[in-house]
Amino acid sequence: MKKVSKLLMTGLFLGTLILGGCSNGGNTSDSTAKENGGANTDEKVKVSFWAAAVSEDRQEFFDWFAEHVTEIYPNIELDMLGVPGSLDDYRQKLDVAIQAGTAPDITNDFRPQLVANGYYENLNEYFDNWEDKNLISDELVNSNKTYDPTGEGLYALPYGSQPWNMWTRVDWLDEINQEIPTTWDQFFSDIESLTDKSDNRFGMAIRGGAGSANTLEMLMYSYSGITNYFDDNGKATINDPKHVEFLQKYLIDAYGNYTAEDDLTKSWTELASAFQSGRAGFVFHNLGSGKSMAEAFENDTTKFAAAPFPESKEGYIVHAGLMPLGLSMNSESENKDAVWKVITLYLSKEVQEKYGELYGEVPANSEARDTDFFQNTQYMKVGTDIIEGKNIKFNDTPYYLPSYTNVQSDMEAQIQATMSGNMTPEELLNEWAEQLETAKAEYEEWAN
């Protein structure tokens, strides 16, 4: 547990150091016209926006958005920077800029550490007075508020989400006269029926490599129907007996029998390959893979389809809490009203349509969700229904814990040990619960 503690405290300490050096070159005594984004003058106002992990096609979108801002607001010039590389590269660049006082007005990587340390502006007042606020998904807004220790502050305006789903080979199911399974019992029956080892064909593929813990968490809670990660006494629910039962079926009984042996080390890339090349009947991922799935199967939905997770033991579908994300405003920005105009323009129907189709995300804006691509593209329609909460319950995934992803990383080796028979499901989940409880207790002590 010392590892989790050290990671948590180090992250919070570094965040404090970063904010300590943050001036952003700001001058809060600038003119009222500048504070209002030049709303009442012809003065040109510059707003800076850094976007994370921008590829060539994404850069084209952001270049278009910069032009669109000036088209709608002639007095606002958007200084748009698409940062290539990984999310870690972006975070390193941003942290250095914060310390140097050169951080941008808008960022699109929402982090709880920067909420707690005051880097982000609280957007509650802006949002409450925004005429289009009712178009934005309540579930996404509430999810973003979990990054505030009080649960009340909105520090990023959500622009979309990538719900998780079950990718299915519907043509394989047709061969055994089955529909897409809507219960876990049917799912486990189907993977057995679909498996033909002599043909190197398996009912499903398990993500045993990088990212395994994140996927497994979602599936366990989907199976059990539990929607809270902690009880009233701060005890973790991840080691609930229903989760032990699921791991027995999924990691022990299915692995090696209805899955390939090399699933032990598969990351998403290998999982997608197994599904698309006809070696696995089911895989679990998010809608970000929708475009590659559609291309691999040439948009032939008689061969593949997205589906919600099967119903839980309680008779309803459980989806992980939607990941907090959105556009945040630098609390040291000199032109906050202009910044807000840019942020809300990003949430407009036209921009949301373009963004959602490019990134494979369901828009936060309901008008954009009602457009053709999101209503008539099979996998996006599934995601849209999830975001709108149709027959879905969301659990309270603790994304707000600074060490949450570190706990997941620690568990990946233990998951492989369980698949290999060197650890029992009970041992895995008890250790997982202990780490989560420690992370929560330390967070609450720090937050209070």
Residue ranges and their predicted role:
Residues I191-S193, N233-L264, F309:
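Glycine-centered hinge/linker elements that transmit conformational signals in sensory
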Residues Y147-Y159, W164, Q186-A236, H243, ...:
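Extracytoplasmic/periplasmic solute-binding protein
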Residues H68-E139, D174-T182, A274, G278-F282, ...:
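Extracytoplasmic "Venus flytrap"/periplasmic binding protein-like
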Residues E67-I72, E77, E152-G153, E175-I176, ...:
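Extracytoplasmic/periplasmic substrate-recognition and gating elements
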Residues P74, I136-D148, F304-P308, E357-D410, ...:
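Long, aromatic- and glycine/proline-rich binding clefts that accommodate carbohydrate-like moieties
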Residues N124-E139, E179, I206-G208, G225-F246, ...:
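Short, solvent-exposed loop/beta-turn-alpha elements that line the ligand-binding surface or hinge
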